[in-house]
Amino acid sequence: MSTTRPSAADDRGPGTGGSAGAPEAESREAEFTRRLRLTGESGIVPRARDFTRQALHDWGWLPAATDDRRAAAEDVLLVVSELVTNACLHAGGPEELLLRRSPKSLRLEVVDGGGGEPAPRTPHRAGRPGGHGMFIVQRLCLDWGVIRSGDQPGKTVWAELAAPS
C-alpha cells in the first residue's frame, strides 16, 4: 500500500546526491533524468504524456517487446496523466514534470504551487467519472508521497513505479 510519507525539505529522490556539479555527474544525471516546464502552457496533460512517451522510448521501454513491458509503459503514462490532471484541478496547474529512472524504478514528480494535500479516495461509485486519480496512483505505484516546498506554498507530488523486467 502506498503512503504519503513525510520527507525532508531537501529530499529530491534517487539520483540527486553525490558529486553534483561535476561534468560526469551532470552528464549521467541528464541521461537518467528528463525535465519539462509546464507553467503557462496549454494542453498540459497530452503534452506531459507525449514528453513521457518520448522518454520511455529513449530509455528503451518503448516499443515494448512483451506484454509486461507494454503494461509497465501504459501504467507510467496513466500515472503521469493522473498526477498532472490532479495539479490542474486542485493546485492551479503544474509547474514542472520530472522523470528519473534507475535500473529498478522510475520516479515521476509533478511540482505545483498549490497548498492542498492529495489523498486517495476509495471510489464510491466506480462507474462514475471523477475522484479516482490518487486511488489509481496508489494502486499502480510502488510508493508515492508529497514533498512540501518549505515555507512557500507549493509541493512536489512524486510516485515510483517498477521498471519492466
Feature annotation, model-predicted:
Residues M1-T39, C88-S165:
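Conserved beta-strand-loop-beta-strand hairpin that lines the nucleotide-binding pocket
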Residues I44, L83, R128-P129:
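Short amphipathic alpha-helical interaction segments
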